[in-house]
Amino acid sequence: MVEYYEVLGVQRNASADDIKKAYRRLALKWHPDKNPDNKDEAERRFKEVAEAYEVLSDSKKRDIYDKYGKEGLTNRGGGSHFDEAPFQFGFTFRSPDDVFRDFFGGRDPFSFDLFADDPFDDFFGRSRHRANRSRPAGGGGGPFLSTFGGFPAFGPSFSPFDSGFSSSFGSFGGHGGHGGFTSFSSSSFGGSEMGNFRSVSTSTKVVNGRRVTTKRIVENGQERVEVEEDGQLKSLTVNGKEQLLRLDNK
């Protein structure tokens, strides 16, 4: 039986932040698109990691799991002690792809993984130590990703508060056999002393004939992520919270 704490590689007393960091690392490592030569195992591990995160990141589900195990969530234990569990009709796990998509707020994490880390992580107090991790062998993602594998975020001397920084990259091949053109661009203006820092990053790729563009805007501590499909806004998140979209015609 799968043990969720072991799946994420955390202790039973792990904090919510530890669980989130573990999921981020393992979901990126085992995403099937990153493991085209080991897809069966990757899909299994990716699903296990998603299940573990979905349970352990929710205090209520985690408490039930700690007391009754997975059977307490799926209501398959058969014993009377499960009758008191809040999930009387069994908890249904979401698709691992949905968990992955929700976790990253609609943006494409592989666009930022070109540099082995998200260059904007430091805005929200997260450590950049992951930038120096070596990329796993056979990680997929095409020759462009291999070219930049292990490359620190914009170079060791780059500061996210440098004034007027901009860059753009592009490649053919896509991620894990999706095909199509993938591009990434980033620009930043202002500085930490000016108090009006603004950064805009955009990634565009063609998936199944549709052009998907993800724009991330970070300004004065606020993060806004817009996802467009063929020019139509499909999702909008502000500081990780999904916003309702108005359907008014412009």
Swiss-Prot record:
Gene Ontology annotations of biological process type: chaperone-mediated protein folding
Disulfide bonds: none
Domain J: 3-69
Residues in the signal sequence: none
CDD domains in the record: DnaJ
Annotated Gene Ontology cellular component terms: nucleus; perinuclear region of cytoplasm
Recorded GO MF terms: Hsp70 protein binding; unfolded protein binding
Subcellular location field: Cytoplasm, Perinuclear region; Nucleus
Keywords: Chaperone, Cytoplasm, Nucleus
UniProt cross-references to PANTHER family, sorted A to Z: DNAJ HOMOLOG SUBFAMILY B MEMBER 2 (PTHR45168), SIMILAR TO DNAJ HOMOLOG SUBFAMILY B MEMBER 6 (HEAT SHOCK PROTEIN J2) (HSJ-2) (MRJ) (MDJ4) (PTHR45168:SF4)
Quaternary data: Homooligomer.
Function text: Has a stimulatory effect on the ATPase activity of HSP70 in a dose-dependent and time-dependent manner and hence acts as a co-chaperone of HSP70. Plays an indispensable role in the organization of KRT8/KRT18 filaments. Acts as an endogenous molecular chaperone for neuronal proteins including huntingtin. Suppresses aggregation and toxicity of polyglutamine-containing, aggregation-prone proteins. Also reduces cellular toxicity and caspase-3 activity.
Name the UniProt record assigns to this protein: DnaJ homolog subfamily B member 6-A
